[in-house]
């Protein structure tokens, strides 16, 4: 049954994405913020399909920590799920991503319309300069910036190398950082066809002020909070089936 439900979800996305990508292209003349709201509605539909077809819901802890001003999100990366859910949990945002994602037919077209910071991971300091310049521009235009410091999806229970880019941007623009931990990989793993029913937990930490910090120091502080929170989740065994109370509480977010 799980395989069938997962296939239905995949098939639904395959049907939905091409026409929605064409809609995304038609939003080009619109102001950037309005364009974002139209395009990001795709993620709301995808999360609804995920809930109805696969039984995956989510809960958010620490919502009171979300600032009211543009912020840099540094988050754990385990799944494709967070790229959908963050659009619904947080204010309008752009992502730092590998440039090759923009070449994916249909999906890449929609991503390009959202003005991401698309970098060449092998470019070294040139990539840092690009992130700093474009990141400052996006922040000044009122957008949040989402960065996955590990750079790629990491299996549950494992930790990737935390890249310095997000901390570098924060310290060079004086922008606070919001650390995010979650366990989405327990339900929708990297390249996994099966989507396991249950409740994904998203934990939002207190904002971190980068004032008087070196990038490396800030990066270590972010990693310590995220990985500490991941350990707490694993010890608490937060992988569980959805309860009616939790499901009802999250309906407005999916």
Name these PLM-found stretches.
Residues 60, 73, 95-96, 202-204:
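Generic preference for hydrophobic
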Residues 128-254:
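Non-catalytic C-terminal accessory region of glycerolipid acyltransferases
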Residues 21-45, 51-53, 68-124:
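Catalytic core of membrane glycerolipid acyltransferases/transacylases, capturing the structured
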Residues 61, 96-98, 119-121, 149, ...:
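Thr-Gly-centered strand-to-loop micro-motif
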Residues 4-29:
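A hydrophobic membrane-anchoring feature enriched in long, contiguous, low-charge segments
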Residues 62-66:
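Glycine-rich helix-loop-beta junction characteristic of Rossmann-like nucleotide cofactor-binding loops
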């Amino acid at each position: 049954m799980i395989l069938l439900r997962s296939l239905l979800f995949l098939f639904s996305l395959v049907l939905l994405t091409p026409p929605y990508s064409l809609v995304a292209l038609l939003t080009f003349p619109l102001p950037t913020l309005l364009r974002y709201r139209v395009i990001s509605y795709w993620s709301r539909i995808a999360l609804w399909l995920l809930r109805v077809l696969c039984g995956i819901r989510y809960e958010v802890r620490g919502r009171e920590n979300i600032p009211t001003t543009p912020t840099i999100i540094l988050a754990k990366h385990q799944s494709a799920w967070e790229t959908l859910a963050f659009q619904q949990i947080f204010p309008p945002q752009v992502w730092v991503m590998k440039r090759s994602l923009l070449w994916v037919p249909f999906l890449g077209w929609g991503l390009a319309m959202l003005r991401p910071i698309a970098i060449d991971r092998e470019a070294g300091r040139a990539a840092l300069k690009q992130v700093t310049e474009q990141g400052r521009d996006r922040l000044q235009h009122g957008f949040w910036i989402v960065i996955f410091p590990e750079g790629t999806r990491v299996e549950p229970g494992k930790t990737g190398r935390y890249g310095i880019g997000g901390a570098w941007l924060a310290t060079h623009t004086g922008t606070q950082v919001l650390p995010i931990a979650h366990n989405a990989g327990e339900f929708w793993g990297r390249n996994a066809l099966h989507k396991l029913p249950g409740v994904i937990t998203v934990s939002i930490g207190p904002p971190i002020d980068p004032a008087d910090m070196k990038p490396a120091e800030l990066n270590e502080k972010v990693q310590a909070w995220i990985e500490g929170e991941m350990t707490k989740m694993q010890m608490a065994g937060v992988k569980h089936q959805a309860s009616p109370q939790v499901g009802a509480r999250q309906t407005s977010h999916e």
